C-alpha cells in the first residue's frame, strides 16, 4: 500500500488543480520538479530550492547507482539523508540514460548491458535492479524501468519497443513488492496514437500509483508532441497524478497543463542558465549578447528572485564573459524561480477559474 495520496481539487476544461501528499510533505500541482542528476540541483543548496518554492526534486537512478553507489547512500539512511533535501524526491528508472548511450548498449529481454561511462566496465541494468536501487535510495516516487522509444521510429520499431517496456513495467511492479513508495508507470508508443492507447491500457491493467508520458521531447517536431499529448493526457486515470517526463519550455508547460498534465521535470532551466540563456516573462534573454554590457536593468522587472532584486544585466553579462561561477549560480536561481513562479501563477489561475484567460495572455506575451 502506497503512502502517497492524490487529491484532485478543481478542474477547468482538461486542466487540473491538485495536491500530492507524502509523509515528507505535500506537492501542490501542477508542479515543476528541478532536476538533481547526481542528487544536487547544479550550484544550488536545498535551502535555496525551498526558498524558490520547490516541493519535490528529481534524482537520477542511473548516475547515483554508478556513483557514489547505493552502499554509500544507505549509510546516510536515504538519498534525503545524503543530500540534505527533506521533502519528496522522484527518481527516474535509468531507462532514458541507457537510451541515450546509443550504440554503447546491448538490449535483451532481460535488461540492458552497457559500458560504464565512468570507468568503461561492463554493467547490467534490469527492471529488478532498478527497483532495488530506487528502494535503496528511499525515493518517494519510483519510476518503472522502460525503454525510451527513439525518434524517429517506424511503427514496427515503436510497437516492439513499447511491448518490451510493458513487459518490463510488469516486472517492475512485481519487484517493487511491499515498498510503500509510489510507483509510476510510463506510457510509450512513439508518435503512434494507437500504440499509446495499447500502452496505457496495459499499464492500467498492471495498476500503478501514477502515470507518466515518456518518449516525448526526444527530437520530434513540436506539433507531434502536442498531437500525442492531445490524444493521451485526458485518457490517463482521473484519480492519479499525470506526469510528462523531460518537458520543457515555459510554453510547453502551459500547453501541457491545458491538456491535463500535473507534473513536469526538465534540465532546461538549469542547463540553459549555465549557458547564459535566461527565461523572463517576455521570453528568453541571451545574457552573453553585447547589448547587455551596459544595461543597468534587472533580468525581469516582474521577478522577485535574489538575482533580480540585487543585480543588473550588465553585471550578469560581466560574470558570463569572465566565466565566474557566481554567474551560473545567479542565472540558475533566476531561471528556476521563474519556473516555480510560472507554476504558482498557473495554480492561482486555476484556483480562480481563469486559466483559459491566463494561457491566452501568456502565449501572446511570451516570445
Swiss-Prot record:
Cofactor field: Zn(2+)
Pathway linked to the protein: tRNA modification; tRNA-queuosine biosynthesis
EC number: 2.4.2.29
EC main group: transferase
Enzyme active site: 92, 265
Binding site for Zn(2+): 303, 305, 308, 334
BP-aspect Gene Ontology terms: queuosine biosynthetic process; tRNA wobble guanine modification; tRNA-guanine transglycosylation
Cofactor binding notes: Binds 1 zinc ion per subunit.
Catalysed reactions, as listed in the record: 7-aminomethyl-7-carbaguanine + guanosine(34) in tRNA = 7-aminomethyl-7-carbaguanosine(34) in tRNA + guanine
Cellular-component GO terms for this entry: cytosol
Pfam families the record matches: TGT
Entry's family note: Belongs to the queuine tRNA-ribosyltransferase family.
Subunit-structure text: Homodimer. Within each dimer, one monomer is responsible for RNA recognition and catalysis, while the other monomer binds to the replacement base PreQ1.
General function of this protein: Catalyzes the base-exchange of a guanine (G) residue with the queuine precursor 7-aminomethyl-7-deazaguanine (PreQ1) at position 34 (anticodon wobble position) in tRNAs with GU(N) anticodons (tRNA-Asp, -Asn, -His and -Tyr). Catalysis occurs through a double-displacement mechanism. The nucleophile active site attacks the C1' of nucleotide 34 to detach the guanine base from the RNA, forming a covalent enzyme-RNA intermediate. The proton acceptor active site deprotonates the incoming PreQ1, allowing a nucleophilic attack on the C1' of the ribose to form the product.
Database matches in NCBIfam families: Q_tRNA_tgt (TIGR00430), tgt_general (TIGR00449)
Designated name of the protein: Queuine tRNA-ribosyltransferase
